[in-house]
Amino acid sequence: MFYYVIVLPLALFLLAYKLFFTSKTKRFNLPPSPPYSLPILGHHNLLKPPVHRLFHRLSKTHGPIFSLQFGSRRAVVISSSSLATQCFTGQNDIILSNRPCFLTAKYVAYNYTTVGTAPYGDHWRNLRRICSLEILSSNRLTNFLHIRKDEIHRMLTRLSRDVNKEIELEPLLSDLTFNNIVRMVTGKRYYGDEVHNEEEANVFKKLVADINDCSGARHPGDYLPFMKMFGGSFEKKVKALAEAMDEILQRLLEECKRDKDGNTMVNHLLSLQQNEPEYYTDVTIKGLMLGMMIAGTDTSAVTLEWAMSSLLNHPEALEKAKLEIDEKIGQERLIDEPDIANLPYLQNIVSETFRLYPAAPLLVPRSPTEDIKVGGYDVPRGTMVMVNAWAIHRDPELWNEPEKFKPERFNGGEGGGRGEDVHKLMPFGNGRRSCPGAGLGQKIVTLALGSLIQCFDWQKVNGEAIDMTETPGMAMRKKIPLSALCQSRPIMSKLQAHLKG
């Protein structure tokens, strides 16, 4: 009796499931796929973090393009610069301008209406236009330079209180990048000294962390549609996070509406709302706030921590950067953003950090709106396409001694920059769906890193090498947070006198 009631229906379901998906794929010339795919689950059994390293190993066996099956969802992984060029240029770039749909984005990102989650079309193009012309233009970023400088000065002052002590840098770098973004968007300081509302700040920080933890493909229903009926607890959690975040964003929006003279991104968008309310709805503005606060904070802090870790492990590079800053700027004034153009080695350090330690090693997945071909293989409509930037950045066919930290490699143009070479280095993605905040991210990382080098002498704790292992999550953070020793240089006394004056 048990056999007929339980086992037989299950066997029939598995057979029907396999036949259904086999019939859907038999007409396609799909990229090669690893064996040992499980019924229903597909290749979920292979997913051993860090996933970017796993995909790199699979590419060694199956080639620079291979396919995986996660439940009912097919994924294709790209691991070569030439194939990335095929994805991010021409008609394919348009076809691949959609995002896969995940449960977290449905609730947190206002039903896929934010710039990072919206499907390709008129709404997304309008959001991208707003980002490019209104909130992240060169003029707008220049207007907010005083915020970046003030937050960096505050970080330097906090560091100066703990000279010759072991300092964990991650909290300071996180406060720097969060405050920079939140002040630009709303005018508030949420972390460190002189916060506007400490209780609200703590709630906001936890919300951002919880949303990041839930982001991506965490829910079985994202891959197995029939599992949605069993995923109530996860869905309730995501809904609660979305409601809590929306409550904070709405409150911040209302505060900016009352402060009509404020000089923030939200105030600027509200002024545009007066003339074009159909483009600048409250939901659109909250979605832009959300994207800036979540995507624009963690990545810069992570990159800065990797950069400082690399320099401490390569003291000759740290000394070379310090000499460049001393020769070009000296110890009479602090480094400023216009100086960066005259500091090529500092720029090389940032580029090399982006190469070795991209904050999003698999970029953000895309999904084609129609069947396309990549590398001679079929990529059917709706496939989740991932580009392994981490693997491309370490490809020995593209880079000399790819595992080594060598900022000098960018002096000779090894980093590319035009044509197909632009897809050798792509920490912010490429094509139509590349990160709109790339310019801002580079500005804050380069200025903050230059300031840390100019203002302090740095040493490793107990002379021990810095561990460069990454965590297994979607964002490539350091597994062991960076701790270091610092000693103030002469410029710090001038900065402190200036701040007191």
Swiss-Prot record:
Does the UniProt entry include the keyword Nucleotide-binding? no
Which coarse location class applies to the principal site listed for this UniProt protein?
membrane
Alphabetic keyword roster:
Heme, Iron, Membrane, Metal-binding, Monooxygenase, Oxidoreductase, Transmembrane, Transmembrane helix
Q: Which cofactor does it need?
A: heme
Q: Which SUPFAM superfamilies match?
A: Cytochrome P450 (SSF48264)
Whether Cytoplasm counts among this entry's keywords is: no
- Which one Pfam family would you cite for this protein? p450
- Give binding positions for heme: 435
- Show the GO cellular component annotation of the record: membrane
Query: Which pathway does it take part in?
Result: Secondary metabolite biosynthesis
Q: Which GO terms describe its biological process?
A: indole glucosinolate metabolic process
> What stretches pass through the bilayer?
288-308
Q: Which CDD domains did the record assign? A: CYP81
Q: What class of enzyme is it?
A: oxidoreductase
Role of this protein: Involved in indole glucosinolate biosynthesis. Catalyzes hydroxylation reactions of the glucosinolate indole ring. Converts indol-3-yl-methylglucosinolate (I3M) to 4-hydroxy-indol-3-yl-methylglucosinolate (4OH-I3M) and/or 1-hydroxy-indol-3-yl-methylglucosinolate (1OH-I3M) intermediates. These hydroxy intermediates are converted to 4-methoxy-indol-3-yl-methylglucosinolate (4MO-I3M) and 1-methoxy-indol-3-yl-methylglucosinolate (1MO-I3M) by indole glucosinolate methyltransferase 1 and 2 (IGMT1 and IGMT2).
Q: What is this protein called?
A: Cytochrome P450 81F3
- Where does the source fall among the domains of life? Eukaryota
State the EC number(s): 1.14.-.-
Location(s) in or outside the cell:
Membrane
Instruction: State the family named in the UniProt similarity comment for this chain.
Output: Belongs to the cytochrome P450 family.
Annotated GO MF terms: heme binding; iron ion binding; monooxygenase activity; oxidoreductase activity, acting on paired donors, with incorporation or reduction of molecular oxygen
Q: How does it sit in the membrane?
A: Single-pass membrane protein
